[in-house]
């Protein structure tokens, strides 16, 4: 019966795991026979097999979900976005480079209806559709078909899937694999990580897994403490009994941290370390507030010493390849990557967008339109590996889908976050009426949030920052995890008047 009630959870988890195992979702042709069926399964789970409350029948659960779906602006915005992505299939133009013989013979390169969204390659557009349709169907399923327990279970599955993908790295290294999952699909025998053909994408993926794992571990600690208080047992005795139950989530969390470091992605090295430090301080602050003053002083000294030892060992025992990447990190380099200074991609992408500001040039259109915009000097320095990306996800999406497409995506993101921000406001108001000993640490704006929600937001911000200087969100494994984890945040929020 529990399995039946969790069908929606498992089908969303299956879609997220499929993206990550199908080479991060970057191999478009491999998604075609898989992802449409998984999207249909999630849609079936959303409409027919939503999770039920304890005193609810299946019919009542379906009625509840259908009613909320119809009233939710997010549903209609997502459907409108799907229609927007479908229009280019009916409005195909020609590529100045790929279709040059046809254009030279007199063919009109413009799409049949110039004032509507278009593409120059339908298979490329289909690849983008296979990113967003399953991802956003998963978002609706998580929001409406999963209860709070289902949302939490989903993220547990995602974290353990990340753990398996990290273990794959060690196995591939030991067996001398020449490509992801022992295939020859990698562009370079040394340039892949786990199932990802581009290590920088893998770095962002494992950074997110690390943040999610850390947040779930914090939640596990709080649940155990609440259980001990309710049962009224001796805490010292139970702390030994429940040690494994308290801390087993640190295993995938630690493995994901080292996996992110070992991708040798400088952005991931910086971001995963920063997230680790922030979550360490957040955890220490919350725990110290619950202790008496003598225990607080003792724990503070021990914690500071432990942190100093970890930092010292990290600096002294850092592997040579990691040290080599860390040595190249400086403020100027970071700003250059985020602004695109010194690379032609940002200038070329901006030039293309100015010519097609509203609807862009269609899925993967940048690679078809970039060469005519390049100077002779830039053509001589043409980037062969990774040159189809702007290495700025925000700008590339704007170029390929225009202001309208970017507007849809921004609206969807706001609608996902809006219910959580309302509950956040309720928690802030409620915290002001608590007794001083019961209040969260300062600043309340941060510590009033449950730790998993704070960790999810940190991971999302890290991905958005990384996307300014690279292309992590061109991997649907990361794109789907970004949106779905944000949609799952309400599984950790306490009930308020805006629940």
Where in this protein do the model-derived segments appear?
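Extracytoplasmic catalytic-loop and juxtamembrane helix elements of membrane-embedded
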Residues: 98-111, 177-192, 321-338
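Helix-to-loop transition at the C-terminal end of transmembrane segments
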Residues: 25-28, 90-100, 170-181, 316-324, ...
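Short, charged juxtamembrane terminal tails flanking transmembrane helices
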Residues: 496-499
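TM-adjacent membrane-interface loops and short helices in multi-pass inner/ER membrane proteins
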Residues: 198, 343-387, 394-397, 401-408
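Flexible juxtamembrane loops connecting transmembrane helices in multi-pass membrane enzymes
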Residues: 191-195, 275-276, 295-297, 312-354, ...
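N-terminal hydrophobic segments of proteins, predominantly signal-anchor/transmembrane helices
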Residues: 11-26, 43-134
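Alpha-helical transmembrane segments of multi-pass inner-membrane proteins
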Residues: 1-21, 35-47, 82-83, 123-318, ...
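Juxtamembrane membrane-water interface segments that cap and precede transmembrane helices
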Residues: 19-22, 107-121, 183-196, 340-344, ...
């Amino acid at each position: 019966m529990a399995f039946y009630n969790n069908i929606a959870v498992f089908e969303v988890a299956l879609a997220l795991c499929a993206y990550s195992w199908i080479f991060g979702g970057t191999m478009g042709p491999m998604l075609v026979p898989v992802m449409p069926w998984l999207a249909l399964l999630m849609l079936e789970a959303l409409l027919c097999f939503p999770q039920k409350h304890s005193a609810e029948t299946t019919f009542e659960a379906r009625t509840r979900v259908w009613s909320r779906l119809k009233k939710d602006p997010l549903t209609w915005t997502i459907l409108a976005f799907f229609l927007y992505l479908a229009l280019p299939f009916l409005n195909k133009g020609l590529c100045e480079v790929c279709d040059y013989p046809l254009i030279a013979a007199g063919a009109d390169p413009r799409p049949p209806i110039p004032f509507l969204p278009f593409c120059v390659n339908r298979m490329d557009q289909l690849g983008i559709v296979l990113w967003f349709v399953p991802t956003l169907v998963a978002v609706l399923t998580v929001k409406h078909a999963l209860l709070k327990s289902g949302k939490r279970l989903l993220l547990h599955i995602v974290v353990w899937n990340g753990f398996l993908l990290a273990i794959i790295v060690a196995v591939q290294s030991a067996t001398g694999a020449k490509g992801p999952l022992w295939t020859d699909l990698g562009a370079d025998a040394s340039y892949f990580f786990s199932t990802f053909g581009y290590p920088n994408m893998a770095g962002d993926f494992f950074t997110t897994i690390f943040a999610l794992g850390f947040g779930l571990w914090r939640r596990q600690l709080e649940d155990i403490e609440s259980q001990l208080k309710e049962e009224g047992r001796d805490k010292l005795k139970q702390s030994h009994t429940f040690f494994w139950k308290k801390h087993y989530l640190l295993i995938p969390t630690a493995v994901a941290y080292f996996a992110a470091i070992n991708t040798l992605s400088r952005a991931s090295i910086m971001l995963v370390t920063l997230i680790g430090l922030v979550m360490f301080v957040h955890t220490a602050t919350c725990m110290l507030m619950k202790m008496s003053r003598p225990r607080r002083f003792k724990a503070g000294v021990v914690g500071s010493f432990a942190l100093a030892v970890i930092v010292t060992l990290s600096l002294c025992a850092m592997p040579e390849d990691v040290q080599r990447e860390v040595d190249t990190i400086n403020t100027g380099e970071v700003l250059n990557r985020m602004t695109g200074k010194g690379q032609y991609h940002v200038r070329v992408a901006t030039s293309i967008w100015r010519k097609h500001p509203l609807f862009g040039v269609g899925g993967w259109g940048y690679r078809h339109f970039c060469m005519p915009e390049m100077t002779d000097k830039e053509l001589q320095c043409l980037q062969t590996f990774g040159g189809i990306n702007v290495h700025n996800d925000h700008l590339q999406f704007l170029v390929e889908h225009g202001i309208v497409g970017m507007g849809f995506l921004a609206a969807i993101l706001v609608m996902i976050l809006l219910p959580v921000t309302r509950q956040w406001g309720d928690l802030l108001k409620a915290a002001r009426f608590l007794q001083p000993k019961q209040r969260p640490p300062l600043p309340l704006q941060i510590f009033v949030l449950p730790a998993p929600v704070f960790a999810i937001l940190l991971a999302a911000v890290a991905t958005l920052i990384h996307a300014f200087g690279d292309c992590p969100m061109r991997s649907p494994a990361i794109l789907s995890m970004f949106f779905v984890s944000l949609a799952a945040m309400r599984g950790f929020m306490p009930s308020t008047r805006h629940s």
